Design a protein with these regions (language model features):
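Bacterial N-terminal signal peptides
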Residues: 22-32
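Cell-wall glycan-active module
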Residues: 15, 30-33, 327
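Short, positively charged
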Residues: 26-27, 50, 208, 224
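Domain-terminus/edge residues, biased toward the C-terminal soluble/receptor-binding domains
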Residues: 161-165, 169, 173-178, 182-347
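Active-site-adjacent loops and short helices of periplasmic peptidoglycan-processing enzymes
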Residues: 31-182, 191-192
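Bacterial N-terminal signal peptides that target proteins for export
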Residues: 3-24
Length: 347
């Protein structure tokens, strides 16, 4: 007699399988849900048009985030101040302490007692993002890295970075070292405004140190037309961060992204929001303040000559090139003030 085996499970087996399947799906759903808030807790982004300060894109721009190695932008800002003041030169040698040499990677693996020039320190911070070099700079400028963190925070306040606190020069993990995407955009704008003579360092694609070549982590310098800065950053608590500056057709944008899941996805998102932002602004749309930052009120006599001499502004005070002749650059509102016979600028 021939025995036929059923290809179907028994009722009990099928019930058990369905129970296991439903349980597995529920577990995966819960796991996925728990991952999303973690990613969202790290993500923030902003794009600003540099000249006008117009915000073209913003997500969580004022939420507190870990800067990671974006911290080194401020370290470089303060180092550039030393160069500007003449207290240091590019050839100044900075000593390496045991504390600096002990910093965890990324690093140049400097040894205690060695020195590094200011110029090489700048390249190492921008390309290799060397943590040992950051501590060397902090100690050279303020004696200890802790004191340097206080100085960094004071400078942040002076630049309008009200939500930023620094505790070290490198961006290595510290629970109280916090910033926002908006504050980092402010720092990038201040860097180019205050130190245009040094800003070109940020477009350096590679740096050689004692026979070794270190490439810049900012891949947009090679992959996104018009990029000329500025810095990447990563620690576990922050995700992959990036501040980028890009200029196309006379329009300069500052982009900041926090919390990327990888360097590649972070860069892709930066390109996406920059592309969208470039489409929203054109060179002719950019407006800038070329005179007073508030209303100007002046009294004039009732009887006026046919023309009033208006001295041109000093070229040194103009943030942008003068417009072509006969270009409408602004307007003046006049109002008659009672019977006194004087004209006053309208408020």
């Amino acid at each position: 007699m021939r025995t036929t085996r059923s290809c179907f499970w028994s009722g009990d087996t099928a019930v058990r399988f369905r129970t296991l399947l439903v349980g597995a799906l529920c577990f995966l759903a819960i796991a996925a849900a728990s991952l999303e808030p973690a990613r969202a807790a790290k993500y923030a982004a902003i794009v600003i048009e540099e000249t006008s300060g117009k915000v073209l894109f913003a997500r969580n721009a004022d939420k507190s985030r870990y800067p990671a190695s974006l911290t080194k932008i401020m370290t470089l800002y303060l180092l550039f101040e030393e160069l500007e003041s003449g207290r240091m030169t590019m050839r100044t040698k900075l000593p390496v302490s045991r504390v600096a040499a002990s910093r965890s990677p990324s690093k140049l693996y400097l040894k205690p007692g060695q020195t590094i020039t200011v110029k090489d320190a700048i390249y190492a911070l921008i390309t290799k993002s060397a943590n040992d070099v950051a501590t060397v700079v902090g100690e050279a400028l303020s004696g200890t890295e802790r004191e340097f963190g206080k100085r960094m925070t004071r400078k942040a306040r002076a630049l309008g970075m009200s939500a930023t606190t620094f505790r070290n020069a490198s961006g290595l993990p510290h629970s109280k070292q916090r910033t926002t995407a908006r504050d980092m955009a402010r720092l990038a704008i201040a860097m180019r405004r205050d130190f245009p003579q040094y800003f070109g360092f940020f477009s350096t694609k590679s740096f050689r140190w004692r026979g070794k070549r270190f490439g810049n982590h900012n891949k947009l310098l090679s992959n996104y037309t018009g990029t000329d800065g500025i810095k990447t950053g990563y620690i576990d608590a922050s995700g992959f961060n990036l501040v980028a500056t890009v200029e196309r057709r006379g329009v300069r944008l500052i982009g900041v992204v926090f919390g990327g899941r990888s360097g590649r996805t972070r860069d892709a998102h930066m390109v996406e929001i920059l592309n969208k932002s470039f489409k929203r602004v054109k060179p002719g749309d950019i407006r800038t303040q070329i005179a007073a930052s508030s209303n100007v009120v002046r009294a004039l006599p009732k009887t006026l000559p046919k023309s009033l001499p208006v001295p041109p502004p000093s070229p040194d005070t103009l943030p942008v090139a003068p417009p072509p002749r006969r270009t409408r650059s602004g307007s003046i509102d006049l109002a008659l003030a009672g019977e006194s016979g004087y004209l006053e600028g309208a408020p």
